[in-house]
């Protein structure tokens, strides 16, 4: 598919950890982690996408959200090329008990299980784990490159 896909992702923080799901690229043989969210539907605001996707996939309600930034993500997954414009939000989960759960299990639209877990930002910063989309870690820790003017 040669189209740019707009998506919205939300970062949920729990001390030094963030809520992510684990993915696996069979072609690269690579395990990676990504924040939760999904495709923005026509006529839908990005923050509403975050709320809808989290309810659909994990059956969890999202409270307050705050816009963090936008990333452009050009990548390959399982041998296919993709191009996304990613609107990133910081958010809070309404059910505070979810911050104590090690794993939150849900279902993707295709029926596959989705397992969200809390991972330390240090694991990504030290290169022990891979966080996608590229640039998300820098956005979260405030290390985006700035132009010298």
Put a short name on every predicted segment.
Residues 61-69:
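A short coil-to-beta-strand element that immediately follows conserved catalytic motifs
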